[in-house]
Swiss-Prot record:
Encoding gene, per UniProt annotation: Nek7
Catalytic activity reported: L-seryl-[protein] + ATP = O-phospho-L-seryl-[protein] + ADP + H(+); L-threonyl-[protein] + ATP = O-phospho-L-threonyl-[protein] + ADP + H(+)
Keywords, ordered alphabetically: Acetylation, ATP-binding, Cytoplasm, Cytoskeleton, Kinase, Magnesium, Metal-binding, Nucleotide-binding, Nucleus, Phosphoprotein, Serine/threonine-protein kinase, Transferase
Function: Protein kinase which plays an important role in mitotic cell cycle progression. Required for microtubule nucleation activity of the centrosome, robust mitotic spindle formation and cytokinesis. Phosphorylates EML4 at 'Ser-146', promoting its dissociation from microtubules during mitosis which is required for efficient chromosome congression. Phosphorylates RPS6KB1. Acts as an essential activator of the NLRP3 inflammasome assembly independently of its kinase activity.
Record protein name field: Serine/threonine-protein kinase Nek7
Active site: D161
Record localization: Nucleus; Cytoplasm; Cytoplasm, Cytoskeleton, Spindle pole; Cytoplasm, Cytoskeleton, Microtubule organizing center, Centrosome
SUPFAM superfamilies referenced in this protein's UniProt entry, alphabetically: Protein kinase-like (PK-like)
MF annotations from Gene Ontology: ATP binding; metal ion binding; molecular function activator activity; protein serine kinase activity; protein serine/threonine kinase activity
The keyword Metal-binding appears for this protein: yes
Ranges of residues in domain Protein kinase: 34-299
Enzyme Commission number, as recorded: 2.7.11.34
Length: 302
């Protein structure tokens, strides 16, 4: 998080300190059992805090969703159902969902903490230094991401929001895919469709045409992410671009080719088949993961 300039004090961080005795019987299912330490992120309708459980000392991320009380009963039920699905995921490259509960009319989600950094920060670092990420480094992280998505898809769970900011990297170089599957519950259609707040560079053509999201939409986003790791910018990025021109570029798959002198034919080909306007022609995650495993083994030993 950026530091506050001296002399400029931000709003005080809300405190959710226990007002009453601990509830050991409730485990991770009440705010009374957590000490909130600091805010580490915020979305349009949610805030994420670093916290620690007062029962076992485990550091966690606590996501508080304010829009929950604006949802109708069906949306709430669907959301809780989705979180229950996410709790069943168990993979070293997927952020673990520990618990969720409603308290003070807010939805609280307790997650594994991954605060060492994320892929967007790494991309910015290389861009600032005017250096490309070495291909073997690209595969080192990408193969872990594919492993995470393979686990999710095998359990019929879509991610729905794959982008560099949702790919966390621990201090030991382990990838953790986070912010799983819940974006559609905590967004406003009007905001997503008509504003450039959080420009949707990774939006697939079928989403532009409102044909619904499917597993192949995750593959499109995965291809965009692989491209961005190599080019240090989104395939459809452009200066002074409005939403209409962005959508046109996406529909036409109009993006600059990756430099062939820096990146292998295999990497460039994988990007091309993932960023295909026709979802049916995109590979499934098993295929992408196989290529990533082969290329990781090949580049790691060279």
């Amino acid at each position: 998080m950026d530091e506050q300039p001296q002399g400029m004090q931000g709003p005080p961080v809300p405190q959710f300190q226990p007002q009453k005795a601990l509830r050991p019987d409730m485990g991770y299912n009440t705010l009374a059992n957590f000490r909130i330490e600091k805010k580490i992120g915020r979305g349009q309708f949610s805030e994420v805090y670093r916290a620690s459980c007062l029962l076992d000392g485990v550091p966690v991320a606590l996501k508080k969703v304010q829009i929950f009380d604006l949802m109708d009963a069906k949306a709430r039920a669907d959301c809780i159902k989705e979180i229950d699905l996410l709790k069943q995921l168990n993979h070293p490259n997927v952020i673990k969902y520990y618990a969720s509960f409603i308290e003070d009319n807010e939805l609280n989600i307790v997650l594994e903490l991954a605060d060492a950094g994320d892929l967007s920060r790494m991309i910015k670092h290389f861009k600032k230094q005017k250096r490309l990420i070495p291909e073997r480094t690209v595969w080192k992280y990408f193969v872990q991401l594919c492993s995470a998505l393979d686990h999710m898809h095998s359990r019929r769970v879509m991610h729905r929001d794959i982008k560099p900011a949702n790919v966390f990297i621990t201090a030991t170089g382990v990838v953790k895919l986070g912010d799983l599957g819940l974006g559609r519950f905590f967004s406003s259609k009007t905001t997503a469709a008509h504003s450039l707040v959080g420009t949707p560079y990774y939006m697939s053509p079928e989403r532009i045409h409102e044909n619904g999201y499917n597993f192949k939409s995750d593959i499109w986003s995965l291809g965009c992410l692989l491209y961005e790791m190599a080019a240090l910018q989104s395939p459809f990025y452009g200066d002074k671009m409005n939403l209409y021109s962005l959508c046109k570029k996406i529909e036409q798959c109009d993006y600059p080719p990756l430099p062939s002198d820096h990146y292998s034919e295999e990497l460039r080909q994988l990007v091309n088949i993932c960023i295909n306007p026709d979802p049916e022609k995109r590979p499934d995650i098993a295929y992408v993961y196989d290529v990533a495993k082969r290329m990781h083994a090949c580049t790691a030993s060279s």
